[in-house]
């Protein structure tokens, strides 16, 4: 009995076989007429006849209406369909247009399909012959009843029947619907030539759901018999054949198909058909695939867990191997869960020598690698991509209904027993009724379809379907690859529950935390024992040296000299015998900086850090702002000389060079003796500041975790001052005293790469678990794919979920750090998720963190931000917020940032400003109501006083703010970007540019438009920003038609390649021409269009190549791609000369010290963005003087933005400075100290520069 086809791709023809695109829609065509070599078509609508039609344009087979089975088996993302949609709002009726499916929101099918299908409408409709077509960015939601499936001719055609084509076939691509493809075009050519030579009229039409080439005669009206022509091929020659037929005697194919399907469906109950593995891609069949309970009746079949067991192996393959082996694989994003926990962590061993140990209740993994493909891998930087290392730990098989003890019959299951049984079974010819081994029966019992005839299904299952698709080799250890299967819904839930239960058991198994004093005493004992052991070894070695005779010492010295003469060059440092012996016995290194080597021990010559890893030393004479609120004065011990004490100004905060870090052995510095030497002065003070705020004191005996004075704090150090390394050092020491606290580090996507490199660079012993975002994880999985042989292969989404759960479990099991991006955190914290594991991970992230670290914590500062709301729900008050630019735009955002870092700040503000709240000792209200109340008081009292024009009132507001915040804010304002005087220097110039004639005309028109609005409309601001760079850029915006007519846009469009029409463009080209041979240039821009334009200009003018001399860094690049671009630009000797970067994509957390010239093409509303962008180049590691050019267009909105930005920067300085800050207008001076800039200005003949000012406050050289 034949099996019933669940889905059929071929379909009978519609009564109207073709459709034609006209009047903005696809209209059905009754027939195509060929007469005298001319083709005409007749439309079904009103019987219109269109003459001289070419079959290559706007004509195709008619699309068929989608059915319920299409939603189940055919429709998927990235296929083209025809949809019924109202293009314009003023249209009376919807029209049929082509579109592409973006995504499908699946819903259960009951009486009809209720799935929501997101599609994008093509812009160029009817152009099915074009290879490249434009498509709308915005998607629309439609239903199944609005979709038609595209059709093409079936590959088989008739040669001896009255019809030429019997079926059409479903088509997924718009390109493949062309009639010029396949065998229809030669037929059409034959009919056209025949109609001319023989004067015969043909009609291509549908007769009883079949397409015929009908011959039109005068006798058709009087006779029921029709004539058609068919074409046959004999000996390579096409011959025509005329066939007469009666339409009434022909059976409709649609009825034929229904009868056939009904016949195929009712099979004999004794016949058990083997499970057919679907060959479709990206589709899940709409069948019942799992059940967690026993069915009420025995009728029908229930799919159980489809496990196939063989020699299980984990193969790491390249992308090409994955594509070849997975040609029919399922890449849907639905949750297909593997038995990944059945595998042991992969080890790098030889496949022929791998002998894994036998374990009870586990399946042994044999590691195999494919040898082919050598030489195809490109060499990549080790740190350019964050590696993905999947780790799978074994889970007992009993959790999935498999009895591991039954394998082999003994108490344990060995690899040899398993493979001996399988080889014995496979070596025999498998026939029906053959007796199976006990192990095979167990496997079949777990793999079977449960039903009334399951015993017969065992006997009638063929051995071919259960065997490997790979041929058997002589090597018995060679792994076998089985056909891919997927887990049922019940197995998926069990696996997820197992992971979550593991986390719960890990949390429950944690012992009660010991007191800080007990933990400290235990650490001291451990360190004392280790030190005592080292001293004993040292004494023994010294005793041995004393007993050595003088002759032996001479011989040893001579051997060392001989070896040195062969190994060392004359200019290398030679290590004496005493230092060599000290190094062998465990030298207490005293590192000194050697400019050619790095951090080198002066005792034994050991190199601690190479010169490439050594940061430039920070200057000591920097202002250090720290208050003593909630901190005892006795905790800060200073050592001042007599002269310094006499000259100290008590109205100012103590100089950082005057306050030295505590050196007592009974404090937290004893926890990180090696890292302490690598911290700069300001970092050491911040280290103690963190301990006082988070734990209460630097001395463990004085720490009280229940104290009300401890809480969140802010590290506001200048960009590039080493905040990341400071936090790494603090976490290393913190976890030693508080191992039960689970630190969670959240960072922007761009800085995750920096965090990862820092942990590797400093060799931190604390385990770090990095949770990738979904897209980044899938990209890593493509680069290094893990293939599961013989078990269900998971989808990428499932692998990501398992990876997150596994890392969270390890985070709970051992003292470690969990690092993730803000985007991933927001995704996992969604409360409206329908998946139980998502809700569980959100619960864990809210309740488990004992310490929350927020890198670049000023980003989630909006009151309505979903990220900020999620962060406020994390149940810990111990938080550390890192920011180089704490004050952003206004005091409302500043208040939100402080509340995020220190939730107690809300109560502190209310106690200080709300007399009613202070009298009642707090009011029991909802947290968000208290926050709104505190925010209102903060803005009405403090912010208004600081914004006031009266100096005394402003000073009063600043003092109130400092009294409330200085206790938990540690501010470090180094020179320039915080890198200190050791850096070569920084010069910042503001260039006010005169516009060209065409620029002036455009900008004047746009400035007049602004006067009609209240505020600054975004569209007008965008147009002004683009026009100030180059006039042609206004045409790159979609809103340009609102301000310019078509004639003006046409004239502007001709200026694209004329660089002289833009004053900023001319300055960039002049600067690059003068410095390109010896310096690299970093160009920041807010929009993408200028980046693309400059790329084309550099290619045309300098003959550079994109990706070689020209590099771009924009927001659409994934994390690992950004890392590659940064490493390429920073690599010494790389041919890259210019990096065009989006200021939003790389303004924070990355190092671009290869550039010594920075150009800011447009101004920003937020001064912190400009400051962060400058800090990408002016930071530790910079070897040259950095020149920054801020370009402004005279008399435009850019000048207003610059003045507003300067005021915000002044307010920020007033908040964090103890001294009076001068008027910001005095920061600028009209002078030029840059030789290159002076040369450009001297040669300027068109007077492009209106004013050039140097920022004296921000510049250091």
Swiss-Prot record:
Pfam families: Helicase_C, SNF2-rel_dom. Residues 1067-1232 form the Helicase C-terminal domain. ATP binds at residues 717-724. CDD domains: DEXHc_ATRX-like, SF2_C_SNF. It is found in: Nucleus. Keywords: ATP-binding, Helicase, Hydrolase, Nucleotide-binding, Nucleus. One of its GO terms (biological process) is gene silencing by siRNA-directed DNA methylation. Transmembrane segments: none annotated. The keyword Transport does not apply. Residues 458-479 are annotated as: Disordered. Residues 704-904 form the Helicase ATP-binding domain. The keyword Hydrolase applies. A motif (DEAH box) lies at residues 855-858. SUPFAM superfamilies: P-loop containing nucleoside triphosphate hydrolases (SSF52540). InterPro entries: CLSY/DRD1 (IPR044567), Helicase_ATP-bd (IPR014001), Helicase_C-like (IPR001650), P-loop_NTPase (IPR027417), SNF2-like_sf (IPR038718), SNF2/RAD54-like_C (IPR049730), SNF2_N (IPR000330). One of its GO terms (molecular function) is hydrolase activity. PROSITE patterns: HELICASE_ATP_BIND_1, HELICASE_CTER. One of its GO terms (cellular component) is nucleus. Belongs to the helicase family. Probable chromatin remodeling factor. PANTHER family: SNF2 DOMAIN-CONTAINING PROTEIN CLASSY 2, SNF2 DOMAIN-CONTAINING PROTEIN CLASSY 2-RELATED. Interacts with NRPD1 and SHH1. This is SNF2 domain-containing protein CLASSY 2. It comes from Arabidopsis thaliana (Mouse-ear cress).
